[in-house]
């Protein structure tokens, strides 16, 4: 027979609350451990000490409110600078700024130069993440590790200062490898956001059920699938109603020439506009890290669609469209009837399965 004490103990375990209905306030890293015991977490303005991660492991269903600007101290180290985890989290940036002080790190070399903390923002929560300005990420800005649905909206990645040279960059733009959103997860939507940077606005390396819509990408490398390495899958990706301005390319799929066992499928573009592309309007290239070199055959690409209206204009000297598929690696019919390109040179296409579009 189970004793009364045992039953009481069991009930205490079963009905214990995972977090207190209280408000925790963070004004320094010393406040974090007590604040994350509460279901409402408020972040005031403060400076994160150099070489430390501002890490919030929030209880399920918690709300995190940013109520002031946060600056991250300068130090050459691996990072990340900020980390958020938890299930069903509501993160409200309220228009405040997280400043990574990338201008103190930038040397025009990105990952090939001095050590820079990256990613700046490691988001492993599910739920919503909205209305935050992230300024001057030292290197890559956002990476995601959500294991359930995450909606990101009204986020600004402002690395515009990196477009100018500084004393370390030998006349080149100081920012480099400053990707906006690096994605290797599923069930992610990014919408109504702005990226000004010097690398990919969006880079999808693996994952499925990904939506990127109504975003603005300026001065970087455009919207990219890849680079795709071995034994990964990218599927069901929707690129909708985005504006790409003055990027190296508008829309790109790139796979490693040496990669094997990977698939890219169900990539759907609609309602996008790209202007001022300096290298390529649309490029699908299976020769990475070369550009338009000998294409590999170990990644299968299928069902790439341009629907509705996608308008792409390139600068003089740039190519409108380049498709460089490995032998037999691109499969099926790709309907590109929704793609309109202009400016520069026509480019070349080595895959016969594209319909509704010719160069």
What residue spans do the PLM features occupy?
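C-terminal hydrophobic structural anchor segments
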Residues: 277, 287-337
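Extracellular beta-strand-rich solenoid/capping regions of secreted or surface-exposed proteins
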Residues: 28-36, 48-63, 71-90, 101-126, ...
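Acidic/polar low-complexity surface segments
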Residues: 69-81, 93-119, 153-180, 220-230, ...
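Fungal secretory targeting signals
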Residues: 1-21
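Right-handed parallel beta-helix/beta-solenoid
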Residues: 15-34
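Right-handed parallel beta-helix
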Residues: 63, 87-97, 125-136, 148-170, ...
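Sequence contexts marking disulfide-bonded cysteines in secreted/extracellular proteins
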Residues: 21-23, 37-39, 324-331
